[in-house]
């Protein structure tokens, strides 16, 4: 096993400029994620959590600073290389599942594999395995409209893991769910972490759910606090 972090960000800054006005969304954010780690970043709306996740996933570029994933600087990668990295090595989960409405659960989960060049039969077999891993093997032929909110988010989790990523970035994955389903989703993330060794970085406003992760950080006004407080928690 490598002694290097799975992902590291160094002095990340993100500034949005409009004419003479500017907004500093992130200010000198630095931290690392270890292989197999369960980490939560807690913060209120507008604190910079989602912007940070976009930078870590190569969906946006920092104004300054650097993101290093498994020894590779995202700043040095082309757009094509970043897209390939996202497809093959990173998983993403969002507050809203973003499932394709005209496709079944199985087809939605298989989609990243097909985009990556897998044969249809192989993609379907792997998608079946992942749906079974999240407890939805009997719902594989259902479309999103035929699934509950919790089930749709489980499909989204299966889709994020189908390429066996080393790291999954989750942006408020339980924000659109009731407490029972939110608890179930967090339990599932923990189970998948143990079973598959996948690292998860979850950004959330829910302190109680975040405390169930192995490490918690707090985002305040674009800066990362390497401790967690009860201030502003819901």
UniProtKB/Swiss-Prot annotation:
The entry's keywords: ATP-binding, Cell inner membrane, Cell membrane, Membrane, Nucleotide-binding, Translocase, Transport
GO-annotated cellular components: plasma membrane
Domain ABC transporter: 7-233
Topology with respect to the bilayer: Peripheral membrane protein
Primary location class: membrane
Keyword Protease recorded: no
Any Gene Ontology biological process: transmembrane transport
Database matches in PROSITE patterns: ABC_TRANSPORTER_1, ABC_TRANSPORTER_2, LOLD
SMART domains per UniProt: AAA (SM00382)
EC number: 7.6.2.-
Coiled-coil positions: none
GO MF annotations, alphabetized: ATP binding; ATP hydrolysis activity; transmembrane transporter activity
UniProt-annotated binding residues for ATP: 43-50
One Pfam family it belongs to: ABC_tran
Places the protein is found: Cell inner membrane
Membrane listed as a keyword: yes
Role according to the record: Part of the ABC transporter complex LolCDE involved in the translocation of mature outer membrane-directed lipoproteins, from the inner membrane to the periplasmic chaperone, LolA. Responsible for the formation of the LolA-lipoprotein complex in an ATP-dependent manner.
Quaternary assembly: The complex is composed of two ATP-binding proteins (LolD) and two transmembrane proteins (LolC and LolE).
Family that this chain belongs to: Belongs to the ABC transporter superfamily. Lipoprotein translocase (TC 3.A.1.125) family.
Protein name: Lipoprotein-releasing system ATP-binding protein LolD
Gene name tied to this protein: lolD
């Amino acid at each position: 096993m490598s002694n290097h972090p799975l992902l590291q960000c160094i002095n990340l800054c993100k500034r949005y400029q409009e004419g003479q006005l500017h907004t500093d969304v992130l200010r000198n954010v630095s931290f690392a994620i270890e292989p197999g780690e369960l980490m939560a970043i807690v913060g209120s709306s507008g604190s910079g959590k989602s912007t940070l996740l976009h930078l870590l996933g190569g969906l946006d570029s920092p104004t300054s600073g650097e993101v290093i994933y498994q020894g590779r600087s995202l700043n040095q990668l082309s757009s094509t290389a970043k897209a390939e990295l996202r497809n093959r090595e990173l998983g993403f989960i969002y507050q809203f599942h973003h499932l394709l409405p005209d496709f079944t659960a199985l087809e939605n989960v298989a989609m990243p594999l097909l985009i990556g060049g897998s044969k249809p039969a192989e993609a379907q077999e792997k998608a079946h395995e992942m749906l079974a891993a999240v407890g939805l093997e009997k719902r594989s032929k259902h479309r999103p409209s035929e699934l509950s909110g919790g089930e749709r988010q489980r499909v989204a989790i299966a889709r994020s893991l189908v390429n066996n990523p080393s790291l999954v970035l989750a942006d408020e994955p339980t924000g659109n769910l009731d407490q029972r389903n939110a608890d179930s989703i967090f339990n599932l993330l923990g189970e998948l972490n143990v079973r598959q060794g996948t690292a998860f970085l979850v950004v959330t406003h829910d302190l109680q759910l975040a405390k169930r992760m192995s490490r918690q950080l707090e985002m305040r006004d674009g800066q990362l606090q390497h401790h967690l407080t009860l201030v502003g928690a819901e």
